[in-house]
Amino acid sequence: LDAGSEAIIVKTDVSKKDSINEMVEKAIQTFGKIDILINNAGIRHVKKLLDHTKQDWDDMISVNLTAPFLASQAVIPHMIKNGKGKIINFGSIASFMGRPDRVGYVAAKSGVLGLTRALSVDLTGKNINVNTICPGLISTPFNQKYAEDPKHGEAWGKETVVGRWGQPKDIVGAAVFLSSDESDFINGSEIKIDGGWLSSKVRKGELDNE
């Protein structure tokens, strides 16, 4: 915005197709085209497996998986008309592993990887790239209660190779890159931004410098 760009806010219920379509049409009316779509809405219920209701499950799938599909479906015709486009879905480290008390979230975020791959194939020849960013422990309002938890917060951060929780700024570079022409040969892929958390489960005393 400091560079003179224009932004609008469109209140949208991403669980509803009509609301998503209205958001897209408002963007087209305002800017004339859509070059980039970032599917980053997300919710998470943390409950024991047997306490996880069907409504909890439906909520997880609707917002975390169905919404990226519907938004992509709404935007893709405009990108085809433009002759190019970039779609960035947001997965999670939960896309690659089970996590306790998060059955719906893990299932939905795993599905995002499949959605990304399928979309990239279906859009062959359309000059539209579809990729996924998979954040790890990022200190945002979404994870605030875990990051600030005196028992687990600092300990979880130290389990990353980098040795800390990530910050929102750690995500920005990947999003900008995947939105740019420099990523034109990357399609149907995912970038993990987790401080090495998935690569090596470091425990205190295991490193040579400790």
Regions found by a protein language model. Name each.
Residues 1-31, 45, 55-56:
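Short-chain dehydrogenase/reductase
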Residues 47, 52, 98-107, 118:
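Active-site loop-to-helix junction immediately N-terminal to the catalytic Tyr of the SDR YXXXK motif
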Residues 92:
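Residue(s) in the substrate-gating loop at a strand-loop-helix junction
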Residues 97, 176, 187-210:
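Short C-terminal tail/terminal secondary-structure segment
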Residues 72, 108, 116:
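Active-site helix of classical SDR
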Residues 77, 121-125, 184:
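Alpha-helical segment proximal to the catalytic Tyr-Lys
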Residues 48-49, 56-61, 156:
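Substrate-binding pocket helix/loop in short-chain dehydrogenase/reductase
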